[in-house]
């Protein structure tokens, strides 16, 4: 599996989650050429939660004939600007979205690690990070 394929598979699964869609959330992949614009559009135009699927680290996990086995950290960031997002009822907060992401993706393939929350003062946004471990074979 290629890294982009993994990210797209996860983003597609999240965009297919009715609870996230109804809560004004949209998942995008980090390696998209337009990721910054996509995040900005989601936060400023739709004024919902932007969910960014990333794979920041890889560690070799043995060897095999089919490719390179790796363990990767899958990071999903749920980003919101509360003053925009929370103006309408029925919208999910970044933390709400992160909890749904964690519970909907935790499986034998994706092992949930943690949820961590932070604030970015310059952009007035809240970022909630959901981390998983996943083993794949890069080919």
How does the language model describe each region?
Residues 1-65, 92:
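Small/polar-rich, solvent-exposed N-terminal microdomains that initiate assembly or binding
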Residues 19-24, 45-49, 92-139:
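Acidic-leaning, charged glycine-interspersed low-complexity segments
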Residues 82-94:
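Short histidine-centered catalytic/ligand-binding loop motif
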């Amino acid at each position: 599996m290629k890294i982009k394929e993994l990210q797209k598979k996860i983003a597609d699964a999240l965009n297919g989650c009715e609870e996230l869609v109804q809560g004004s959330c949209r998942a995008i992949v980090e390696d998209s050429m337009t990721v910054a614009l996509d995040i900005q559009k989601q936060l400023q135009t739709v004024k919902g939660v932007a969910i960014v699927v990333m794979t920041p680290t890889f560690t070799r996990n043995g060897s095999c004939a089919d490719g390179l086995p790796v363990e990767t950290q899958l990071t999903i960031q749920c980003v919101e600007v509360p003053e925009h997002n929370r103006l309408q009822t029925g919208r999910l907060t970044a933390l709400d979205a992160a909890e749904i992401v964690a519970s909907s993706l935790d499986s034998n393939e994706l092992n949930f690690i943690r949820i961590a929350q932070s604030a970015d003062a310059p952009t007035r946004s809240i970022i909630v990070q959901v981390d998983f471990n996943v083993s794949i074979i890069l080919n």
